[in-house]
């Protein structure tokens, strides 16, 4: 880390830091003085909310950060899922970004990958609403990723 990182948390808010879950009992500011893997509670996707292909990919990628002990297994599932998504999506912007996201995870930059996946949600919503991806394809992806939910 080139500089310190300061994060403000509200009372009762949780943060996932290097696999540990911390909850604060009052408004606090935390300053990270060195490299750390963290995820803010409002960026954590719950299993029941992983209802679309990209949200399912996000859920798997967040497991790499939240559960360091299972990172190898999560990364393996991420690889399988990203290959499936690249084969299912036809939108050039989504395909290019999926390849970049795969590279981010390969480089150990899962946090940045999560941001990139979230940025694709509006495009995915348009694709699914226009049924550019068939319901059968979406269901196939859901079944493949179901063990993670």
UniProtKB/Swiss-Prot annotation:
Has a post-transcriptional repressor function in flagellum biogenesis. Associates with the 5'-UTR of fljK mRNA and promotes its degradation. This is Probable flagellum biosynthesis repressor protein FlbT. Keywords: Bacterial flagellum biogenesis, Repressor, RNA-binding. HAMAP family: FlbT. The lineage of its organism: Bacteria, Pseudomonadati, Pseudomonadota, Alphaproteobacteria, Hyphomicrobiales. It comes from the Bacteria. Belongs to the FlbT family. The keyword Repressor applies. The keyword Cell division does not apply. Pfam families: FlbT. Disulfide bonds: none annotated. One of its GO terms (biological process) is mRNA catabolic process. Transmembrane segments: none annotated.
């Amino acid at each position: 880390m080139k500089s310190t990182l300061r994060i403000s948390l509200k009372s009762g808010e949780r943060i996932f830091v290097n696999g540990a879950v911390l909850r604060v009992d009052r408004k606090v500011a935390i300053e990270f003085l060195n490299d750390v893997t963290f995820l803010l509670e409002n960026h954590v996707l719950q299993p029941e909310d992983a209802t679309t292909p990209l949200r399912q990919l996000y859920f798997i990628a967040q497991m790499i950060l939240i559960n360091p002990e299972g990172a190898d297994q999560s990364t393996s599932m991420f690889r399988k899922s990203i290959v499936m998504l690249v084969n299912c999506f036809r939108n050039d912007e989504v395909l290019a970004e999926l390849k970049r996201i795969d590279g981010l995870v390969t480089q150990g930059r899962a946090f940045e990958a999560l941001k990139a996946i979230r940025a694709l949600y509006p495009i995915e919503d348009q694709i699914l609403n226009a049924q550019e991806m068939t319901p059968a394809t979406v269901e196939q992806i859901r079944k493949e990723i179901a063990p993670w939910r």
